[in-house]
Amino acid sequence: MDVYGLIGNPVGHSLSPPLHAAAYDECGLDARYVTFEPAPDDAAAAIRGAGALGVAGLNVTAPFKQSAASAVATDSMAARVGAVNTIDFSGAAPRGYNTDVAGVKRAFAHHDVSLSGAQAVVVGAGGAGRAAAFALADAGATVRIANRTRAAADELAADVGGTAVGLGDLPRSLADATVLVHATTVGMDDPDTSPVSADALHDDLAVLDAVYSPVETRLLRDAAAAGATTIDGAWMLLYQGAEAFERWTGLDAPVAAMRAALRARL
């Protein structure tokens, strides 16, 4: 039996176990997905321990994505993002990847949204915001970053060759935008809040909200009312998981089965 897993703290809320279990069942794999919850400063030791125990692959979630990038060798994209959310132990040494980047790209592709040449705005410069910004820039979009802390927006904009804008400038920045990614926790605890005023949204936008609980956020409701294409955060979660599965197994991910398992729990 192959063992895969997730490290984070906490991990009890994670939807990765049912997501991956559905993939293993659909593909007839003798595999199991488990969770590990090391102390906040023990990421490197936990990764080494997982490898020593014969774990085939790990997903990494908060607060360990950045420390994991320092604990293992990474591919070029994970190095640029500065965060690892997937580790493969199949080689001579563990190797880290950031499948959140692919999760963003594949979520837009699923909804027939082209990112090449897009005018994109990303709200948030944390882990999800960084992955989104790199995904958009790598796909050929022009990227503007808005964040509560301007220094973080400036840093991320410089990293992706984009532009930082103030949160107060969002309506003006969105006027000619074709893509909006929201990558903060706004709307998670209070589903009636939104990071963007409804009157700044329009029907030329494709809006991805990285929040997936609730699935339908205030931002997505307002965007739909404005005629925009809406993409909930469960699509990003689904496709980052599919990308990890494909890296570990070399098989095409059974996306439909994984999506059904995910939606059943949302």
Curated annotation (Swiss-Prot):
Alphabetic keyword roster: Amino-acid biosynthesis, Aromatic amino acid biosynthesis, NADP, Oxidoreductase
Example GO BP: chorismate biosynthetic process
S-S bonds: none
Catalysed reactions listed for this entry: shikimate + NADP(+) = 3-dehydroshikimate + NADPH + H(+)
Binding site for shikimate: S14, L15, S16, T61, N85, D100, Y212
Pathway participation: Metabolic intermediate biosynthesis; chorismate biosynthesis; chorismate from D-erythrose 4-phosphate and phosphoenolpyruvate: step 4/7
Top-level taxon in the UniProt lineage: Archaea
GO terms for MF: NADP binding; shikimate 3-dehydrogenase (NADP+) activity
Protein name stated in the entry: Shikimate dehydrogenase (NADP(+))
Organism: Halobacterium salinarum (strain ATCC 700922 / JCM 11081 / NRC-1) (Halobacterium halobium)
